[in-house]
Regions:
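A short SAM/SAH-binding and catalytic strip from SAM-dependent methyltransferases
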Residues: 120-133
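Class I (Rossmann-like) S-adenosyl-L-methionine-dependent methyltransferase catalytic domain
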Residues: 1-53, 57-59, 65-114, 130-144, ...
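A short acidic, Gly/Pro-enriched loop at the edge of an enzyme's catalytic core
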Residues: 113-121
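Short glycine-rich loop/turn motifs that provide flexible caps or phosphate-binding loops at active sites
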Residues: 61, 123, 149
């Protein structure tokens, strides 16, 4: 899929909390993360793309129902997974029940970023919901919490039916332009784009 950087812009305002609450009120798993083959494949590619065998502390904002959180628990000593919707948190906690190294919390981003630092950050299908200002705050705040030499994995949906729309292509271009990040791995197909960056310094 051929794209030109800058051919779409972020939403003027970040998608509201009410928007996401409404999605969960209409359907337990709004994006069918637990059952859709494309998401299962995306998660498998994401896990295979992590450069290191094991990480000390992982931050996963926008964890939804916790499918990727379960997989990250196998590779990380500690996982902090967060979502803004109470119902998503309930489901993610159920999915990770029995995994003592996973903590699921409710957080509204970018206002409620976590304390401490991480050697892995995993962001999936989140950044294109943010306004330009909130995206900048989210990236700056998240990267401030990523340790030097730590990895950031981002994976986002590609809108193959409407290739001019603001999607994963655009938010990953913003990530790639962020100072202090070194590209490590890139995967792109008709369904999603995935990048792994390493923090320099």
């Amino acid at each position: 899929m051929t794209r030109t950087q800058g051919d779409a812009v972020p939403p003027e305002e970040s998608f509201s909390l009410d928007h996401f609450i409404g999605l969960y009120e209409a359907k337990d798993d709004p994006w069918d993360n637990a059952t859709k083959w494309n998401d299962q494949r995306k998660y498998a590619v994401a896990m295979a793309s992590l450069p290191r065998v094991r990480y000390r502390r992982c931050y996963e904002p926008g964890c939804a129902v916790g499918m990727l959180s379960v997989m990250l628990a196998e590779r990380c000593d500690e996982v902090l997974a967060v979502d803004c919707v109470d119902e998503a948190v309930v489901q993610a906690r159920a999915a990770t029940a029995g995994l003592a190294n996973v903590r699921v919390e409710r957080a509204l981003l970018p206002a409620e970023l976590p304390d401490g630092t991480f050697d892995l950050v995993v962001i999936g299908d989140l950044l294109y919901y943010l306004s330009d200002d909130d995206l900048r705050l989210m990236l700056d705040g998240t990267l401030a919490r990523l340790e030097a030499g730590g990895d950031l994995l981002a994976v986002h949906f590609r809108d193959r039916q409407n290739p001019g729309n603001y999607d994963g292509f655009n938010v990953h271009a913003r990530l790639a332009a962020h100072p202090g990040l070194q590209p490590v791995i890139r995967h792109e197909d008709e369904w999603f784009v995935l990048d792994v960056f390493r923090k320099i310094g």
